[in-house]
From Swiss-Prot:
Its EC number is 3.6.5.4. Fungal signal recognition particle consists of a 7S RNA molecule (SCR1) and at least seven protein subunits: SRP72, SRP68, SRP54, SEC65, SRP21, SRP14 and SRP7. InterPro entries: AAA+_ATPase, P-loop_NTPase, Signal_recog_part_SRP54_M_sf, Signal_recog_particl_SRP54_hlx, Signal_recog_particle_SRP54_M, SRP/SRP_N, SRP54, SRP54_euk. GTP binds at residues 110-117, 192-196, 250-253. This is Signal recognition particle subunit SRP54. It comes from Yarrowia lipolytica (strain CLIB 122 / E 150). GO terms for molecular function: 7S RNA binding; ATP hydrolysis activity; endoplasmic reticulum signal peptide binding; GTP binding; GTPase activity. Signal-recognition-particle (SRP) assembly has a crucial role in targeting secretory proteins to the rough endoplasmic reticulum (ER) membrane. SRP is required for the cotranslational protein translocation for ER import and preferentially recognizes strongly hydrophobic signal sequences. It is involved in targeting the nascent chain-ribosome (RNC) complex to the ER and is proposed to participate in the arrest of nascent chain elongation during membrane targeting. SRP54 binds to the signal sequence of presecretory protein when they emerge from the ribosomes. It comes from the Eukaryota. Residues 1-297 are annotated as: G-domain. Residues 298-536 are annotated as: M-domain. It is an enzyme of class 3 (hydrolase).
Amino acid sequence: MVLEDLGKRINGAFANLSKGGDIDEALDAMLKEVCSALLESDVNIKLVSQLRQKVKNSVKATPNGASKKKVIQKALFDELVNLVGVDESAASAAKFKPQKGKSNVVMFVGLQGSGKTTSCTKLAVYYQRRGFKVGLVCADTFRAGAFDQLKQNATKAKIPFFGSYTETDPVAVAAEGVAKFKKEKFEIIIVDTSGRHRQESELFTEMVDIGAAVKPDSTIMVLDASIGQAAEPQSRAFKDASDFGSIILTKMDGHAKGGGAISAVAATNTPIIFIGTGEHIHDLEAFSPKQFISKLLGIGDLQGLMETMQSLNLDQKKTMEHIQEGIFTLADLRDQMGNMLKMGSLSSIAGMIPGLSGMASSISDEEGTRRIKRMIYILDSMNQKELDSDGSIFKEVPSRITRVARGSGTSIREVEEVLQQQKMMASMASRMGGKNGMMSRMQNAQNNPAQMAAAQRRAQQMMGGGAGGMPGMGGMPGMGGMPGMGGMPGMGGGMPDMSALQGMFPGGMPDMGQMMNMVQNNPQMKAMARSMGLGI
């Protein structure tokens, strides 16, 4: 059972709890379904049994007059977080915070085939996109082709690398590579070490020797999520031999035992800092237990979305100014499309937005990215006068559409769809702009961490009906106008607090069911959603 299916099963159990009837019977049925789903995901039976008992104990302690349903929902959420998390002191101690202007050495360890070399490149890209000067060192002299693999990955990602085809001593290669990058003032130096097919003593000796030579600021173990519960003894064995501080769990995107692997690692009290969610170099997500469970249950991860946007330093200043004036040009649309590609996969972004998580499975990341790129080709084929316009120039001179289609290698229909999307965004911008517009109200709420935390808590309290149908769960306004669900124009300044958005709708914010009906019943919105790769 992949994690997506696990989330659906748990959400289905929540939905049954909301149907009414005897609450105690509903609790037993819900726990039976949740525990069954966890066991199928290879979570240890002892851990599942403990979760069931802790939830029941929390419900028994419910004070008179309190809502049992809310207590059950909160208790299960908290216990799921505890299942995949470690205590705060261990997480804080292992948290790697690289400093700019200083050389930070990171050493990777793990068994062969765990995805270690690929994860090295992913982490390098992760920090490179955040402004760090990153270098890769291949100290894996055991596996044939290891240096070629790292070289290929690093070249594709445009990351400087170091390795040797002739030197067979991994300690010498590691020391030389780290010394070279330190001399050249690299800020993050990632050392890839050798792996083995099993836990051999030579591997552990080699890890200790390399660690002594390069003196890493952080040692990360890479584990394959497909091994499920076996992650616990494997991580304990490595922990005893090399005192690594944290773990990257790979292959979380398509294996049935991902949940079991996470809970098994958590049982060792070793924090997971990243999870690999795909084969591409950008498919690496920072791991937070609360945010992970929130996304799993379809609640979204507003905090994670904000952190992603802020860490990438997306340039939204010009678009923000236009929105405040009630304007949205074709150039603004091009900027938004570019920012979408920088943020990562569409399904990952969808998973961070409350209520849209359930739609993530209908998005093919490859197809969505392809369509966004084609939209950018179309916009890049326009001249500056056209880009600075509101699109009406194409209506006045229709031959421009044909010229742009030919120049971009696309069809007239695709150009018209881009113009239609810009028109819808411009219409939204006109409603949002001005002193009394939505943007003005949003700015009063954004950039406020306390309000953001409160918004996430409110989302958690609305878990009753599962993703896409949580009772009373507010959807994001104007979903049809969000470029590929990347967010409202100007969202780079921070997501607005949900309570602030509530006040902008006199009748209350529409839930996701209502919003989907709006899309289905509006041909323009439906066409635009399809153009973005949504299965609508």
